[in-house]
Structure formats: structure tokens, C-alpha cells
Amino acid sequence: MAPALPWLLLWVGSGVLPVHGTQDGIRLPLRSGLAGAPLGLRLPRETDEEPGRRGSFVEMVDNLRGKSGQGYYVEMTVGSPPQTLNILVDTGSSNFAVGAAPHPFLHRYYQRQRSSTYRDLRKGVYVPYTQGKWEGELGTDLVSIPHGPNVTVRANIAAITESDKFFINGSNWEGILGLAYAEIARLCGAGFPLNQSEAVASVGGSMIIGGIDHSLYTGNLWYTPIRREWYYEVIIVRVEINGQDLKMDCKEYNYDKSIVDSGTTNLRLPKKVFEAAVKSIKAASSTEKFPDGFWLGEQLVCWQAGTTPWNIFPVISLYLMGEVTNQSFRITILPQQYLRPVEDVATSQDDCYKFAISQSSTGTVMGAVIMEGFYVVFDRARKRIGFAVSACHVHDEFRTATVEGPFVTPDMEDCGYNIPQTDESTLMTIAYVMAAICALFMLPLCLMVCQWRCLRCLRHQHDDFADDISLLK
């Protein structure tokens, strides 16, 4: 299912919050008074919302729950009478799918037979991921978000009847809401790298639909263009570890794409970039030795509660292309973001962490560890993504997560990776060349066959002539 939201805001907090959506056809007016605003790199806070509009978003604040390693979800209702489900918010896919059969990891599931508004489309659905899969049946039903816009829409729903390594024990969500573009709403999946078994503390955040809530961020919003409308693809132009440039060709950062994906836990980097980044992080944190398995995300490191030496780990800065020509901005994350806390049962008195930067074979993925602590605006109407520091941003005694700019960066368009395209004329040329090569190989064979046939005919004629002579004798 491809959502059609002009504006979506995801704000994932870094602390525990009190407990207090987005389908095909939802189109909401932007409550920000931006009709004539110029497209600048920064959007001053006083110009992007009409006075008195703050109350419009009160019901949407703190509507996200979840865990960093298991995804963040929003409460939704499906069917008539409404059935309440927790749905994972995923900006890296475009399908809307819910559990529709009993499963050991589900406390509840969508029961189609109890909905008077369910319509069966009589189509099967099969979606494989790098790890795991699910399959089910496609239909439509009425959907709404209680802590969201006051809108009920009919949406396409994939009812999951069978799955393998898709639902996560203890995650508390029963379905997935893909908020990316229609181009990737194919019935297959590229990857679903959430963690299946680790227990972590619950945190919360907000998903605001239709505008911007200024109470949830500090400073200015900085926007980067959406390069292509499939995933939320952006362009990274520079990477620094503790202020030291990795000095790589910027195309390496975006090979074969760079996306913002709330459905992925880690910051995932292409192989060359990952190796360079880990080397720099190791050098910066050399006062302590860590096992190789830690850097590969396979082992935990633990310290006595309250004694984690955050200061030995470097900050990581990603520079993103800005909206103004030759200008970029940077987002800086702290080790409190890329060292993900994990509750280790065996050593519950310790603070244990997992390295949340991993290697990728499908480009850079800015996952939940990047988005946590930032206010992220998915502005589909203007084809851009905004970043600001959240109101509960990550910080320690000396450092804080930041969004800063502008920085002069020429030729940023060259940093984007372009998949080689082979046009039809090239394919036809290749086909003709192959046909000519085949003809050259076949010609000698044909000549040999013809020669053999001729010799056989001549021999047959000679034998007949010999028989005639013997009869005359």
C-alpha cells in the first residue's frame, strides 16, 4: 500500500515517555501557512506555522511507542467495529500488512470475519525479506489513527496468515505501515533487520501528520532534497569521525543509495565506508580494548551501572546536501546513539551495549539510531526531508547531538550514485553482434554439411553406375 501523505513528521525521543497513521488516500492540508514561503535551506520557526495551530497536534504528541532494536509503532484501528492494533512505522517500505492469524508472538490479531466493511480482493501476497518472510491475502477495510488526524479511510491491507522471522517476541506490534513511495510497493522486501530477541528499555516519540509541532524541537530545521521518490533517498557528501574527514570519494557514501529508514535499527554503511569508520572509531577509543565481535555487532560490552565511559567514544557527523546550491549541513550523533543499550539478563547489574553501526550491501541506511534524538520531517509535498535537534536530544556533560550549517560543499550532485542504464538501442546492437558471431561460427559447419551431402550424392551415383555395368556384363 502506498501512502499519499504530503507531510509526515517522525520524532523519536531518547527517554521513557508516558503513554498517551496514514493510509492510501489520506491527504491532509499543511497546517503551517507555507503557501508562499520560499524554498530556503533553513525554515525560521516563526514562519512555518500559523498562530493558534499548536492545539491541532496535541493528540498526536507521544503517540509512538517501542524499542530501538525492535521498532516504533503507532496505535491504529482497522475494520467495523474497530479493532485496535499496534502498527510498526516503517519509512523504508510501502506495504500495509497486519497479522491476521494466531501467532506465538502476537497478543492480538486482525480478525477479518468480524469486520462488516472488509472486502476480499482474492489476491495472494508473498513478501520475502533477506531474513524472514510473510504471506497472506489482500483486501481492503476502513482504517484510522486514534492519536492522529480525525480521518477514516479505506485502505489496501495485506492480511498476514503465515510468517517466518517477521514478528518479534516482546515487540508489542502486530503489523507494519510502509510510508515510502509507491515505486517500492512491490510484493517483495529488501531487508528487515530488526533484532529478534534482545530486551531493551521502552522509549517513545511522536508521529505528527499534516504539519510541524515546534514544541518538539530546538533550533532550526535544515532540509535535504529527496533525490528520488522510491525510498526516502538523500545524498551524503561527507563523513567525519570526531571532526576528522574520512576523505573518501563521496560516491562511496551513497553506493548504491542512501536512505532514511525508521524500520531499520542501525546506521548501515557500505563496506568500504564501514571499514574506514570502524578504523577511525577504534583509533579514537583506543584507551580500551574491545573484542572484534563487538565491532561486528556480535558481542556486547558491559560496564558497571552508571560508569559507561562515553567520553572515549567519538562523535560521528554526516553531511547532507542542502537545498541551496553548494551548501550542505551536518547532523552529529553521539556514542549514546550508536551504542545501543541492551538488557543482559545474566549481568542485569551492568550497563550493556551493542555496536549499532553495521556493514551494508545495499547502500547507506540511516536507521533508528540516527533518527533517535532528532526531529525528522518527511515533506513529500516539497520533496525534502528536514532535520532538527529534538526537545529531548541526547547529550552528556560535554557534548550534544547537533544539526548545524551551512557549509560550502561544491559539486554535491556528483556524490549521488547513478545506476548504469542500458537503453534499447544498445541492447539491439549487442543482439546484432551476437547474431553475427553465431553466423560466423555456423557458416563453416553449414559448408561442411553441404560438402558431405554432395560427396554422398556423388558416391551414390557412382555405385548405381557400377551396378548397371555389372548387369550388362
Curated annotation (Swiss-Prot):
Post-translational modification, as annotated: Palmitoylation mediates lipid raft localization. Acetylated in the endoplasmic reticulum at Lys-123, Lys-247, Lys-251, Lys-257, Lys-271, Lys-272, and Lys-279. Acetylation by NAT8 and NAT8B is transient and deacetylation probably occurs in the Golgi. Acetylation regulates the maturation, the transport to the plasma membrane, the stability and the expression of the protein.
Any Pfam family matching the protein: Asp
Maturation-removed propeptide residues: 22-45
Bilayer disposition of the protein: Single-pass type I membrane protein
Residues carrying lipid (S-palmitoyl cysteine): C446, C450, C454, C457
Position of the Glycyl lysine isopeptide (Lys-Gly) (interchain with G-Cter in ubiquitin) cross-link: K473
Entries under InterPro entries matching the protein: Aspartic_peptidase_A1, Aspartic_peptidase_AS, BACE, BACE1, Memapsin-like, PEPTIDASE_A1, Peptidase_aspartic_dom_sf
Transmembrane regions: 430-450
Catalytic activity: Broad endopeptidase specificity. Cleaves Glu-Val-Asn-Leu-|-Asp-Ala-Glu-Phe in the Swedish variant of Alzheimer's amyloid precursor protein
Domain Peptidase A1: 72-388
Chain span(s) of sequence motif DXXLL: 468-472
Residues on Extracellular side: 22-429
UniProt modified residues of type N6-acetyllysine: K123, K247, K251, K257, K271, K272, K279
Family matches, as CDD domains: beta_secretase_like (cd05473)
Gene3D superfamilies in the cross-refs: Acid Proteases
MF term (GO), any: aspartic-type endopeptidase activity
UniProt KW keywords: Acetylation, Aspartyl protease, Cell membrane, Cell projection, Cytoplasmic vesicle, Disulfide bond, Endoplasmic reticulum, Endosome, Glycoprotein, Golgi apparatus, Hydrolase, Isopeptide bond, Lipoprotein, Lysosome, Membrane, Palmitate, Phosphoprotein, Protease, Signal, Transmembrane, Transmembrane helix, Ubl conjugation, Zymogen
Activity regulation text: Inhibited by RTN3 and RTN4.
Residue ranges of the region described as Interaction with RTN3: 451-473
Free-text note regarding domains: DXXLL motif is required for a proper endocytosis and retrograde transport to the trans-Golgi network, as well as for regulation of lysosomal degradation.
Annotated function: Responsible for the proteolytic processing of the amyloid precursor protein (APP). Cleaves at the N-terminus of the A-beta peptide sequence, between residues 671 and 672 of APP, leads to the generation and extracellular release of beta-cleaved soluble APP, and a corresponding cell-associated C-terminal fragment which is later released by gamma-secretase. Cleaves CHL1.
Protein name per its UniProtKB record: Beta-secretase 1
